[in-house]
Amino acid sequence: MFQYKKYFDEYCEGNKLSLSLSYTMPCGYETAFGTFDSNSLTVFINKNLLKDKEEFEQAFYLFHELRHALQYTNPQLFNNIINESLSYIIMYDGTCYKKVGDKYYKYKINGDEEFLKNLYISQSYEMNVNEFAYKKVCEVMGFSKELEYLYHRWIPKSRILNETYRLIYKEIDKSIKEYYYQVRWWVGFSL
């Protein structure tokens, strides 16, 4: 099995990060290979889901999540497009979240499965972490055709333009503002 803790510690030390590593997935992420929670500064790795995978794949998902941690904790290291997108999470099923402070607000995008998957993997911060994870695993374990195949599974078939994301972000923001206007109206009305 891949030595998660060893590479986690090395990455954190090399990037001056103070993070936690957990193998217990948070609620709602039980079927994910990993996630990073920017509120608790915790990298979650689903060892149970990854236990039968090759070591290069286990490493890929650890480095993927560690790169997310660096994006959130050191945004000055990344370009404006990545930084703009960090407040928005678009999942492969069209479920979206906007982070405001330490809270997440939910939104849903409708579309066919292929479009939504492409929308998810085309996000600037996702493309950045997947490219980083691929290069880091090549550096640590060497190149393999299987690793290259894994990486290409996470490359969008057709890249979605950043302007499209900006329009989606505006729609998410608008929906959140409308929701809070209605809540404030309802609370004021019921008093």
Task: Briefly describe each language-model feature range.
Residues 1-16:
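Zn2+-dependent metallopeptidase catalytic core
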Residues 2, 56-60, 64, 123, ...:
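A structural signal for well-ordered alpha-helical segments within the folded catalytic domains
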Residues 18-44, 53:
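Catalytic zinc-binding patch centered on the HExxH motif and its immediate surroundings
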Residues 25, 47-49, 67:
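Short, flexible loop/turn elements at secondary-structure junctions
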Residues 44-62:
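Short pre-active-site segment immediately N-terminal to the catalytic Zn-binding motif
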Residues 65-84:
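Catalytic Zn2+-binding segment of zinc metalloproteases
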Residues 84-175:
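Metalloprotease/metallohydrolase-associated module, dominated by Zn2+-dependent proteases
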Residues 167-191:
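A hydrophobic membrane-anchoring alpha-helix module
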